[in-house]
């Protein structure tokens, strides 16, 4: 029982990105319910701060993606943060360390902490089923337990001797089963009859650098075919300058409604989204929206990634449905024309092939149901078992 563990539970967490900050915030809700006097320290963002995290560094310090020069440029700073964090945690001796995603940073840290007797939990299984299967050995050495957000993962990890629990995907509870498109449009000043394309070029600066201009060039081509279409772009403050720069470079700034955050409102309001591969694609699927998934990265990162990829899909909706239910355009294939053509197919399907859109929505509804669990409670219970073990 929770009361057998000190009510003054000391938890350390690291979340390295916006998506991890959201997941960790929900996890803290579950922990706080069991241990109201809990204290939490580490690395995180605003969602974690709202739940009482004392942030030693902001999560933006770890928000870097790729394998090549994108990582090498920040390597020294990130290694320095990890070294300082390890020293502080070994001095403080928290009851449990929870690494939220960010496996490149967290697994090494977890391995060091576990070796010194600190309980370690990893929230969001590294995608050994998609690529980098060699990582399974490091996971086994580094963590006491993995909290999985996809239902097939615990059995896969168990085959490698790793304890794991399926806790559902928190977003499946945050996003309503039947999103209110009209309310979302009203909130954004859009009419029910408008045709709306949401453009989400990523949550990292490197993604904005590689995708935003290309996405807005595609929007220009779509605008030529359908001048009445509304384009909505949610932008978090840290990325807004880069997004606005790309908008000006594309000549589309007058046609793009760039708004502060509100990505969920934007996805609820849209008819179709042009979207960077990542967690946002799962959000779009849970909103039951047709999408075109794209990704571009540095040449070296791409060469490494394509050699390690184990599945034919990159986008989470396609991976989870085990089929190309929505198009993916990657690297050199993600031209402005190809992106525009793929979006226009969805726009035209609304009138010409409504059954195609209905079938997609049915698949996404089934996926939503499968992922919907009481994640904060299940995760807190699993952590409780680790603490008692």
Swiss-Prot record:
It comes from the Bacteria. Pathway: Bacterial outer membrane biogenesis; LPS lipid A biosynthesis. GO terms for cellular component: membrane. GO terms for biological process: lipid A biosynthetic process. Keywords: Glycosyltransferase, Lipid A biosynthesis, Lipid biosynthesis, Lipid metabolism, Transferase. It catalyses: a lipid X + a UDP-2-N,3-O-bis[(3R)-3-hydroxyacyl]-alpha-D-glucosamine = a lipid A disaccharide + UDP + H(+). It is an enzyme of class 2 (transferase). The keyword Secreted does not apply. Coiled coil: none annotated. Pfam families: LpxB (PF02684). One of its GO terms (molecular function) is lipid-A-disaccharide synthase activity. InterPro entries: Glyco_trans_19. PANTHER family: LIPID-A-DISACCHARIDE SYNTHASE (PTHR30372), LIPID-A-DISACCHARIDE SYNTHASE, MITOCHONDRIAL-RELATED (PTHR30372:SF4). Belongs to the LpxB family. This is Lipid-A-disaccharide synthase. It comes from Albidiferax ferrireducens (strain ATCC BAA-621 / DSM 15236 / T118). The lineage of its organism: Bacteria, Pseudomonadati, Pseudomonadota, Betaproteobacteria, Burkholderiales.
């Amino acid at each position: 029982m929770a009361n057998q563990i000190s009510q003054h539970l000391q938890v350390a967490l690291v979340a390295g990105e916006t998506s991890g900050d959201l997941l960790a915030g929900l996890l803290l809700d579950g922990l706080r319910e069991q241990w109201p006097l809990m204290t939490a320290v580490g690395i995180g963002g605003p969602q974690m701060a709202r739940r009482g995290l004392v942030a030693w560094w902001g999560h933006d310090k770890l928000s870097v993606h790729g394998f090549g020069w994108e990582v090498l440029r920040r390597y020294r700073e990130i290694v320095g943060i990890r070294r300082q964090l390890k020293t502080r945690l070994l001095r403080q001796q928290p009851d449990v360390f929870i690494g939220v995603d960010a496996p490149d940073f967290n697994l090494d840290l977890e391995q060091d902490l576990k070796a010194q007797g600190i309980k370690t939990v990893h929230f969001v299984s590294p995608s050994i089923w998609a690529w980098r299967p060699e990582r399974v050995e490091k996971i086994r050495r580094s963590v006491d337990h993995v909290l999985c957000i996809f239902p097939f993962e615990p059995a896969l990890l168990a085959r490698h001797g790793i304890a794991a629990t399926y806790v559902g995907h928190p977003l499946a509870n945050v996003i309503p089963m039947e999103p209110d498109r009209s309310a979302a449009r009203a909130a954004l000043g859009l009419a029910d009859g408008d045709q709306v394309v949401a453009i989400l070029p990523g949550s990292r600066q490197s993604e904005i650098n590689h995708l935003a201009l290309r996405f807005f060039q595609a929007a220009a081509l779509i605008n030529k075919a359908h001048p009445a279409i509304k384009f909505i772009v949610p932008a978090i403050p840290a990325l807004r300058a880069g997004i606005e720069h790309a908008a000006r470079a594309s000549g589309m700034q007058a046609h793009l409604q760039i708004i502060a955050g509100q990505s969920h409102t934007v996805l609820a309001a849209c008819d179709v989204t042009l979207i960077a591969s990542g967690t946002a694609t799962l959000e779009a699927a849970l909103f039951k929206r047709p999408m075109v998934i794209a990704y571009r990265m540095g040449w070296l990162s791409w060469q490494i990634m394509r050699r390690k990829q184990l599945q034919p899909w990159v986008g989470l909706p396609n991976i989870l449905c085990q089929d190309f239910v929505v198009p993916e355009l990657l690297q050199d294939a993600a031209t402005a024309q190809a992106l525009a053509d793929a979006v226009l197919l969805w726009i035209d399907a609304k009138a010409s092939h409504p059954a195609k859109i209905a079938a997609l929505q049915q698949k996404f509804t089934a996926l939503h149901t499968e992922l919907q669990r009481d994640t904060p409670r299940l995760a807190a219970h699993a952590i409780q078992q680790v603490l008692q073990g």
